[in-house]
Structures are given as C-alpha cells and as structure tokens.
C-alpha cells in the first residue's frame, strides 16, 4: 500500500479526552475515531490490526476442533426470559422493541442464542461433544465508557460455547480452551496469566480470567512470580489428557482481587501485586442454561439429559489496546510481528530522485511478491516527519532509502523494537527481511 493513497489521519498532539496510552496512541496513529460515547469507527490501520488478531484467534480455535458459526447481534428477549437472565443485566443491556411490539435486545453475550442453536439442531449424545464459536460485535451500555476501545460500549469478541454429555467431558472442553488461550495470547506477543475469577452474571462454579499486567489495568491482581516466565505450551495434542498441563499453571497462585485469599501461602518475595487488564475469560457452568432452556440429548440409556456447558470469551477489540499498553515507547506503538498492520515500512527520503524512486519501487515490489505486507511512504513530507510517522504506527521494520545511500547501493534497515539501525546492501536488507 502506498502511503499517498492510504487513509492515515495521524495527529501530532494528544487528544484531551484520551486518558491512557493505548487510547492516545490509537487516536494519534489514525487507527480509530469516536462515533459516539464508547463507540468507534475503525479506520484502515486499526482494522488491519483487528483482522490480524482475529486470524490468530481463529487459527487457535480451529486447532482445538471448535467450529465457527455466526449468531445475530439482535436477540429475542424471550430466550433471556427462558434462562432467567433477562433482568440480571439491568440497564447495561440495550433493550429494543420492534415494530410488532416484540421485545428484542442488542446482545451483550450469546449463551442463550448458542443454547437455542444447539437444542434445535442436536438431539443425540452421538453428536457430542460440540464446541461452537463466533467473532461478533456486542454491546453493553456502560455507565461511564472510558479508555477508548479498552472499555467501550460496542466491542468485538470471540465467544464460544461447549456442549458435553458428562461433567468429565465438559472439563476436558474447558481445559482445551484454557490451553488454547495460553497459546493465543503468546502468539499475540502477550504474557497472559490465568487467574481464578468470580463467575459474575454468567454463572457457574469454575472460571478463569486471562490477565495481562499493565499499570493502567482496572483490576488489582496477585500471582506467583514464577508465572511471569512460564512459557506457553507448544505442539499440543488436544485429544490427550490436558489436566496435568492445566494443573502446572493453576498450582501456582494467581487470583483477581475478588478471589484473592489472605492465606495464599506464597512467600512474600514471590508474590506479585499489580494491576491487570482482562483479555479473556472462560467459564464452566454445567446445566445452568441447558436445564431451564431444554437443551437435552438422548443419552445412551435412552433417557433425556441436559448437556453440560461452558463459555469462553476473548475481547478481540480490547486486545488491540492491550497489546499497545504492553508494547510502546515514547515515540509510539511497537507492534509484535504477528499483528502489525504492515510488516515493513519502505521510506523514500527523496521522492522525485530517479535512482531513489527506482530502488524504493523495486524494494516495494519484491517484498510484496514475497508475501510481505508493505507500507510504502512515497509522500513528499520531510524526512523527520516520515520517521515520526513510522515510529508512531509501530511497524516492526523500516527500510530507508535516500540518494547518498542508493549511490553506494545501500539502504538503512531499522528495527522498531530495539531502535537499531544498520546500513546494508539492498540484497542483504532483503535477505534479512525475508529470512
């Protein structure tokens, strides 16, 4: 993509309404613009990041055997009355009456709809287990939306719902999501710590939040220091017994403020007390929804049995902000490789110079042909402005070409994360970027 044709409305000054780093940088980098309180337009740069996060989430869900579906954002209130949750959300739920005087709502979550999908389409235990997921927009009418997309009213979420015949099967489904979440967040360049958590209005007796540590986090969190360096699992066999792997994480103390115990037993020097941002939440809630809503299957003995369920959420749009909170410096965003809106920025320092134009066009073409996402700064801005823009938007690599270097057959390669710059031959720079 040529920058001269790309909608990138960057800002030099920090907007007064932005309270935290991620909100400031998302506005300054031209990723989002507010439409209404807690509701945002996603501009091209922001949407590219959102889509890349979606893809990582999707790949890790698919690896577990979960199946993607898409459920409506507007839901029937009757389903929520069936489950008994219609009044639990209070004013946080946006309620709608259609032209036929039917009560509807903009879904804050999808347990009821997912249960309805299941009960209408699965009748026998032979079709179990099932795990259905979607990536869909949701709405919760927060009293005080703040912090940009970190705590907006409209947000993009990956949510899935598991259905099993037995408690043991449901625990295995829960463990699969536990492990998949560890892998997902690691691929996004985040250290997310699973913490025992309150189940809230979702319900159930087993729940973990996945928390990234950040000074701007809204929640107080506590964990054993060893969790900070514990690597995410690789080469997972999701059909195997995952309980030992899950136990290796949950045996180390970690809890949100609501679940924190004074008798935690962690030596004082090993207990980390910090602020955290929730980026994922998983629940096992048995038959809380299936029993009242009649989501049953015919069991092996011929009886009708309510299925055991779990639900699992990742805040996809919130993750964009979370990654920025965890990875930035004074100059702007530092995107991890897997989610950067572009892999490489090519900077032409002298637009109109035939030799420099030719080298930049060649670099741009060869990098794109190799499958790289490239943003080519072909504008006639001054060099300082070009560097500031590239640092602000945080692409992992910058290739800088100017007349002096080009005359020697050289370009400059800059790594955003470290700030290191090296002068290399054009072929060496390409080899480094494509290696």
UniProtKB/Swiss-Prot annotation:
Its main location: cytoplasm. The keyword Ligase applies. It is found in: Cytoplasm. Its EC number is 6.1.1.15. Keywords: Aminoacyl-tRNA synthetase, ATP-binding, Cytoplasm, Ligase, Nucleotide-binding, Protein biosynthesis. The keyword Manganese does not apply. It is an enzyme of class 6 (ligase). Belongs to the class-II aminoacyl-tRNA synthetase family. ProS type 2 subfamily. It comes from the Bacteria. Pfam families: HGTP_anticodon, tRNA-synt_2b. GO terms for biological process: prolyl-tRNA aminoacylation. GO terms for molecular function: ATP binding; proline-tRNA ligase activity. It comes from Rhodospirillum rubrum (strain ATCC 11170 / ATH 1.1.1 / DSM 467 / LMG 4362 / NCIMB 8255 / S1). Homodimer. Catalyzes the attachment of proline to tRNA(Pro) in a two-step reaction: proline is first activated by ATP to form Pro-AMP and then transferred to the acceptor end of tRNA(Pro). One of its GO terms (cellular component) is cytosol. This is Proline--tRNA ligase. It catalyses: tRNA(Pro) + L-proline + ATP = L-prolyl-tRNA(Pro) + AMP + diphosphate. Disulfide bonds: none annotated.
């Amino acid at each position: 993509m040529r920058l001269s044709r790309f909608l990138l409305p960057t800002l030099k000054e920090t907007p007064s309404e932005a309270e935290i780093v991620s909100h400031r940088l998302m506005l300054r980098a031209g990723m989002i613009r507010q439409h209404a309180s807690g509701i945002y337009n996603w501009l091209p740069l922001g949407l590219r990041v959102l889509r890349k996060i979606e893809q990582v989430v999707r790949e890790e869900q698919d690896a577990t055997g979960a199946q993607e579906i898409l459920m409506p954002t507007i839901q029937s209130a009757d389903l929520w009355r069936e489950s008994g949750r219609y009044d639990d959300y209070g004013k946080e739920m946006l309620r709608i009456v259609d032209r036929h005087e039917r009560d509807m709502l903009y879904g804050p979550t999808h347990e009821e709809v997912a249960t309805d999908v299941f009960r209408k389409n699965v009748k026998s235990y032979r079709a179990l287990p099932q795990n259905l997921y979607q990536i869909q927009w949701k709405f919760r009418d927060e009293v005080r939306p703040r912090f940009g997309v970190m705590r907006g009213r409209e947000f993009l979420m990956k949510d899935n719902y598991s259905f099993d015949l037995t408690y043991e099967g449901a625990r295995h489904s829960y463990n699969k999501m536990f492990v998949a979440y560890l892998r997902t967040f690691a691929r996004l360049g985040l250290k997310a710590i699973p913490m025992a958590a309150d189940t809230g209005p979702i319900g159930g007796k087993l729940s973990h939040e996945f928390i990234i540590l950040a000074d701007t986090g809204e929640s107080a969190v506590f964990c054993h220091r060893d969790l900070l360096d514990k690597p995410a699992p690789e080469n997972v066999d999701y059909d195997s017994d995952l309980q030992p792997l899950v136990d290796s994480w949950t045996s180390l103390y970690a809890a949100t403020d609501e679940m924190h115990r004074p008798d935690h037993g962690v030596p004082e020097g090993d207990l980390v007390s910090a602020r955290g941002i929730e980026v994922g939440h998983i629940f096992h809630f048995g038959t809380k929804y299936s029993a009242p809503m009649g989501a049953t299957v015919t069991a092996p003995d011929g009886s009708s049995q309510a299925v055991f369920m779990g639900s699992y959420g990742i805040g996809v749009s919130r993750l964009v902000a979370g990654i920025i909170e965890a990875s930035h410096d004074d100059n702007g965003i530092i995107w991890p490789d897997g989610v950067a809106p572009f892999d490489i920025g090519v900077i032409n320092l002298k637009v109109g110079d035939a030799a420099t134009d030719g080298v930049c066009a060649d670099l741009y073409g060869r990098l794109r042909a190799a499958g790289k996402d490239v943003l080519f700064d072909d504008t006639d801005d001054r060099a300082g402005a070009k560097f500031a823009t590239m640092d602000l938007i945080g692409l992992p690599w910058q290739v800088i070409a100017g007349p002096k270097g080009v005359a020697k057959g050289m370009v400059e390669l800059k790594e955003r994360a470290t700030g290191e710059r090296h002068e290399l031959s054009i072929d060496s720079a390409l080899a480094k970027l494509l290696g």
